Structures are given as structure tokens and as C-alpha cells.
């Protein structure tokens, strides 16, 4: 069964995006699937603005545990975050920067509370490069300008969703995994959404939404 059939219970593409925006404004998470011919995987996404220790613990416990902070190009530049590697030859050109840790307010940096502190420190509009230690336990991702219209990735989808919801343009994501450690695909993502009261949408939905409403995002 393809994504469209599986997600029909969540409404049409526009409704799915609108429900995701409502959830984010309420401080809840959403589940974002990328294209079936790409990774065909789902990420749990939370806004940095509303992020709680409990939500971070859920990502560590129920997902891959590799929690990434999606930042705009401008914020990553402001923090002077260089690429993780000089030559990025990953299949999807995921723009990891060096990993980070808050210099103040954390212990080992690995606990849910410490990761939330690091994330909120880095996403603060007034943050400075010297507020962060490198390396650390949080993995920033640099979103391409233009969002999903430029690159159909979870990073860009996260930043677009925050902007569309009127929230601070920073979000966290973590890939959802199955209990046996394999990657969750669309059927498992739908089940996860029901279990945790999270709407499900796709990158394709977001592209359709932006095209329909002619949304120009940074």
C-alpha cells in the first residue's frame, strides 16, 4: 500500500499540513514522511520553542536516539558552525555541522534535560558561538534556503513547518525506529502517530500546500 492510501485517514494533503501546524502550535509533535523513492522514512518533529524534557526522552527511548537540531542557514552561520566534513558525499547530502554542547547548564550533555538545554541555547536568536562547546551530543543540521521547494528533506521540512506555524524557525527531529531496531516505514509511522496522538504528513503534502498558497519562505 502506498503512502497516499495509508495516509487517507488523516485527510487530504492540505488538511494533513493544517493539522500538523495546529499540533506544533499546541506544542505537540508531528510525523513527517519523505518521498517513497527517497528514504521513505518518518521523523518525529518538535518545535524548539515548545520542546520539553519529556519529548526529548521519547525521542531517545522510542526513536533512533540521534536527535538533530534543524537550523536556518543564517543561524548556523551566526553560531559559526562548520560542516561536519569538508567533502559531504552522503547520498542525500544531509548538511550535518559539527556536533555541539551548551557550555552552561549541562553535565555530561547526554541526558534528555542536557540535550534540551543545548538545543535551546543554540536556537536562541541572541546565541553566540562561544555559548557552545564542540563536539557534543546534539547534531545540528543546516537547512537550505527555500525549504522543501529547494530540497525535499526532513531538515527543510522541519524549518518550513515552523515558519508556516508562526514559530521560531528551529526544530528538532529524530528518525523513528521499530522495536527491533529497523527503520519505521509508512505503516509503522501511522501506527506510531495513533499511539502518540501525532498527525502524519509528507514532504509531498508540504510542496502541494506551498504551491497552492504560493508560500514564499526564507
UniProtKB/Swiss-Prot annotation:
Binding-site residues, Mg(2+) 2: 39, 154
GO CC terms, sorted: cytosol
Alphabetic keyword roster: Lyase, Magnesium, Manganese, Metal-binding, Riboflavin biosynthesis
Residues binding D-ribulose 5-phosphate, per UniProt: 38-39, 43, 151-155, 175
Pathway assigned in UniProt: Cofactor biosynthesis; riboflavin biosynthesis; 2-hydroxy-3-oxobutyl phosphate from D-ribulose 5-phosphate: step 1/1
Family matches, as InterPro entries: DHBP_synth_RibB-like_a/b_dom (IPR017945), DHBP_synthase_RibB (IPR000422)
Region (Disordered): 125-151
Cofactor(s) needed by this chain: Mg(2+); Mn(2+)
Domain of life: Bacteria
EC number(s) stated in the UniProt entry for this protein: 4.1.99.12
GO process terms (BP): riboflavin biosynthetic process
Site (Essential for catalytic activity): 137, 175
Cofactor: how bound: Binds 2 divalent metal cations per subunit. Magnesium or manganese.
Residues reported in the UniProt entry to bind Mg(2+) 1: 39
Molecular function as annotated in GO: 3,4-dihydroxy-2-butanone-4-phosphate synthase activity; magnesium ion binding; manganese ion binding
EC main group: lyase
Catalytic activity: D-ribulose 5-phosphate = (2S)-2-hydroxy-3-oxobutyl phosphate + formate + H(+)
Pfam families, per the entry: DHBP_synthase
PANTHER family referenced in this protein's UniProt entry, alphabetically: 3,4-DIHYDROXY-2-BUTANONE 4-PHOSPHATE SYNTHASE, GTP CYCLOHYDROLASE II-RELATED
Complex and partners: Homodimer.
The family this protein is said to belong to: Belongs to the DHBP synthase family.
Alphabetized HAMAP family for the sequence: RibB (MF_00180)
Job description of the protein: Catalyzes the conversion of D-ribulose 5-phosphate to formate and 3,4-dihydroxy-2-butanone 4-phosphate.
Protein name: 3,4-dihydroxy-2-butanone 4-phosphate synthase
Organism name: Vibrio parahaemolyticus serotype O3:K6 (strain RIMD 2210633)
Gene name for this UniProt entry: ribB
Amino acid at each position: 500500500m502506498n503512502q497516499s492510501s495509508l495516509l487517507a485517514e488523516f485527510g487530504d494533503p492540505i488538511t494533513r499540513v493544517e493539522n500538523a501546524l495546529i499540533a506544533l502550535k499546541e506544542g505537540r509533535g508531528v510525523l513527517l514522511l519523505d518521498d517513497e523513492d527517497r528514504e521513505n522514512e518518518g521523523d518525529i518533529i518538535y518545535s524548539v520553542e515548545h520542546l520539553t524534557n519529556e519529548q526529548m526522552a521519547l525521542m531517545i527511548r522510542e526513536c533512533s536516539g540521534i536527535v538533530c537540531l534543524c537550523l536556518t542557514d543564517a543561524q548556523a552561520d551566526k553560531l559559526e558552525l562548520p560542516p561536519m566534513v569538508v567533502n559531504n558525499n552522503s547520498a542525500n547530502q544531509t548538511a550535518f555541522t559539527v556536533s555541539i554542547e551548551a557550555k552552561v547548564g549541562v553535565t555530561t550533555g547526554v541526558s534528555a534535560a542536557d540535550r534540551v538545554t543545548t538545543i535551546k541555547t543554540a536556537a536562541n536568536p541572541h546565541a553566540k558561538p562561544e555559548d557552545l562547546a564542540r563536539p557534543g551530543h546534539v547534531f545540528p543540521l543546516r537547512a537550505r534556503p527555500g525549504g522543501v521547494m529547494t530540497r525535499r528533506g526532513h531538515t527543510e521540512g522541519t524549518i518550513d513547518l515552523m515558519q508556516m506555524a508562526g514559530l521560531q524557525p528551529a526544530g528538532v527531529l529524530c528518525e523513528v525506529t521499530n522495536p527491533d531496531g529497523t527503520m519505521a516505514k509508512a505503516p509503522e509511522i501511522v501506527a506510531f502517530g495513533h499511539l502518540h496522538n501525532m498527525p502524519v504528513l509528507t514532504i509531498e503534502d508540504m510542496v502541494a500546500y506551498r504551491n497552492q498558497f504560493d508560500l514564499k519562505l526564507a
